[in-house]
């Protein structure tokens, strides 16, 4: 087994620009504290760029993304470990600039604004967060000059906003979304997971469990729609309900039985039941939001929605704030998606 070549550590824009370009350049932007989710992004970038291309990982804890009372000073900084993980995953270079390298004139007076989508969900909970995120992404795209940039789907709203910025401002870079990586028990990988105590981690599992409950509800409803074309509706509903399992509470089952096929309300309700239980746990889960939204603009969808949707959740467990989401597709009434 060959030992991977350590990535070149670059600290300044001059060092980055002095590198001779070869093939396609793929960039993976991180705030450090790398984990398997980041490694998956880097490996995917390596596969897309190919052996003749170049993979650059950025490590920069962006102060503009942290609001008052958030965890900027607490955010883990583990550059030596990051270099090792990035190298094993196939990175050629790691660009880890200081704050004054990215913002040489101090806090920038001109910023990218996230628009209406940036004020919803995460933006409502963290005012200014997405303006700061888009500003640093724009700067890093200019500095790294990639052909493509990869981002995790766990940060679904961030990914949607980056795609919108790249389109609206003609950046000429391909944006690639990579599916969320999870622990065996379903918890989405996050650099902030290391803050959780054993008890807090047990409570935090409710985020993914709630999303999976929503997916189960959605699958049952879509199966009901498909079967409705072939058998009486009453029989189809009974079969769909059985797919949810006998462990569901009676009230939970009743919600499916009385909701319209493809009902967004029923999907939300199934997820909320899990979160309500977690709110009574020790330690409790403090829900920030649960939303079922259109991925094009992150507005809430209604029961008549067809097409793609994102079921998203954010909550605090102890001092740690976590987010997660899943994607699903609603078919038209009476038809499978």
UniProtKB/Swiss-Prot annotation:
Pathway: Cofactor biosynthesis; (R)-pantothenate biosynthesis; (R)-pantothenate from (R)-pantoate and beta-alanine: step 1/1. CDD domains: PanC. Pfam families: Pantoate_ligase (PF02569). It comes from the Bacteria. Gene3D superfamilies: HUPs, Pantoate-beta-alanine ligase, C-terminal domain. ATP binds at residues 31-38, 152-155, 181, 189-192. It is an enzyme of class 6 (ligase). Its main location: cytoplasm. The keyword Cytoplasm applies. Transmembrane segments: none annotated. SUPFAM superfamilies: Nucleotidylyl transferase. (R)-pantoate binds at residues 65, 158. Beta-alanine binds at residue 65. One of its GO terms (cellular component) is cytosol. Catalyzes the condensation of pantoate with beta-alanine in an ATP-dependent reaction via a pantoyl-adenylate intermediate. NCBIfam families: panC. Homodimer. HAMAP family: PanC. This is Pantothenate synthetase. It comes from Streptomyces coelicolor (strain ATCC BAA-471 / A3(2) / M145). The gene is panC.
